[in-house]
């Protein structure tokens, strides 16, 4: 079994919570934590064995690196230190991601070294220029989307000539770069943080191809900088396969896909149901979803609304309940009004997909109080060597309150 002990950042990088373990041992620890968490709600034998991540190394399709700078001026571009939470680790390699991602990081760091006037962004005081470097990997092409996020505060704004220099450094390399974006983070008191995005080079989207192992059903997905997509392509297929098994569709179902992102789950499940309605609040993700619906010829059975989930639920609270609700919310979980809507309309089946079992546990407890029962649970690992995992739960309505 693989371990992380041959990583040069072993013991100091905060990216891996179980770096000293072999992979099978880290899975056992995750299972133990999940069983302890859900013990008040379900018997232990209802939780299926965790599905391992394959491959456990080099499988991540997205990674975000942060810029750090000490008061003394020491710079680093990488991850947060596991021993000093406010300090960064200057990453030179990472066994979880594509090797060439590190070449992009190295070139960016060299560009930064040429510009001592550019300070790392410090969120608590909204000071500094350089925020993050994000790299997405396309599949099966193995090409890259690179996103540099900088401060949009006028005092710390990076000039366009400097950004153009960074772009040309990347393009002069032999790396297979599909897209380069410059993103400015606008944060100020009294307004919600937002991002102004500019495509500097290439196509607006990067592609991911997804296939289900059971029947070969496949689709291609266009992803923009802020489109959500599962971080491991092989595990994404297993998540959707599990959702399909839990639903056990007959072909006549209406499926409501809340927090649908780029439409991945709904599009992949559309061949097995009558129609899919997706809801997503991030414009970038909805733009990707619309592209994906058209590219995969799903206009007749999949539609996506650019709307806050709670607003959608309020607008449709008197409509007929969908046969199945898919919930795949952010780590903070559902909004309370969404939960109330789900309880009010009483759909027969809910498939709750979560990257944060703690919020999932609490919201499942609320759903149980409202007449639902947990029928199946399947954890899936897609964050090797960390404490994180994806957990999929099937709930069915048994009581009309």
From Swiss-Prot:
List of catalytic residues: 355 (nucleophile)
InterPro entries per the UniProt record, alphabetical: MeTrfase_TrmA_AS (IPR030390), MeTrfase_TrmA_CS (IPR030391), SAM-dependent_MTases_sf (IPR029063), U5_MeTrfase_fam (IPR010280)
Binding residue positions for S-adenosyl-L-methionine: 230, 259, 280, 328
Coiled-coil region list: none
Keywords for the protein's UniProt record, in alphabetical order: 4Fe-4S, Iron, Iron-sulfur, Metal-binding, Methyltransferase, S-adenosyl-L-methionine, Transferase
The EC number(s) this enzyme carries: 2.1.1.-
Molecular functions per Gene Ontology: 4 iron, 4 sulfur cluster binding; metal ion binding; rRNA (uridine-C5-)-methyltransferase activity
NCBIfam families found in the cross-reference section: rumA
UniProt-recorded name of the protein: Uncharacterized RNA methyltransferase CPn_0885/CP_0981/CPj0885/CpB0914
Organism the protein comes from: Chlamydia pneumoniae (Chlamydophila pneumoniae)
